[in-house]
Amino acid sequence: YYTGARSQEALDLETEMLPVPDDDHAVGVLRQIRSKGKRRDLYAPMFLIRELYAFVYEPDAADKKRKYVFVAEKSNYAGRQLTYHAAYDMMRRTQECLGMEFHFHDLRHTFCTGLIEQGVDTAIVQQVMGHAHLYTTKRYVHLSDRDVMAHLTDYGEQWKGGVYHDIC
C-alpha cells in the first residue's frame, strides 16, 4: 500500500534493490524495478524499507541468499519467487478472514487517491505511480461531496469578501 506498487512490481522486487535503511531520510528509492516491460523507481517510506530489510535479512531466515523479497515458503517451492497466483490466494484468504472484498489494485488505487486528496501535485503523483501519461493519474481522482463543498465554500468566501470584485 505505502508505495502504490503494482502487484507484479512488488512480486518482482529483488533483494539487491532494497536500499540500506537510512535514518537521515523519510523516503527511500528502490531503483530500476521492472514495471510493465520498462524500468522505474519505486518510492517507499523509510519505515517500510526498514521492515522489508528486516524481513529479508532476519537472523533466522531460511534462505539468506534469496533473490526475491517475496518468496514461497512451502517445501516444494521454498525460496522461489512468489507467484501472482500464490499471492492472489493469500489475498483471498485474507478477504475471507476479514469478511470484506478487496483486490491488489484497490491498494494502489487507495494510495494514489490519498496522495491526490492530500494535495500532492499531480505531476509528482504521476511519477510516484509510474504513469506514462497524466490522464492515467487523473482517473484516480474521485472527489467526495465534502471535498467539492469545502472548495466551493472557500471560493464563495473569496467572492463574498470582494477579492474578485475588481474583475467584474
Where are these regions (language model features)?
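Helix-turn-helix DNA-binding elements, focusing on the entry/boundary residues of the two helices
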Residues: 7, 122, 134
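Active-site/catalytic core of tyrosine-dependent DNA strand-transfer enzymes
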Residues: 46-100
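Conserved tyrosine-mediated DNA breakage-rejoining catalytic core shared by Y-recombinases
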Residues: 3, 8, 12-51
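C-terminal secondary-structure termini that scaffold catalytic or DNA-interacting sites
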Residues: 156-168
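Short, cationic motifs built from Arg/Lys/His that form the positively charged side of catalytic pockets
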Residues: 6, 40, 52-61, 108
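The alpha-helix within a helix-turn-helix
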Residues: 11, 126, 138
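Short, basic (Lys/Arg/His-rich) helix/loop patches that form interaction surfaces
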Residues: 88-127, 131
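Catalytic-site neighborhood detector that most strongly recognizes the C-terminal catalytic loop/helix
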Residues: 129, 133-154
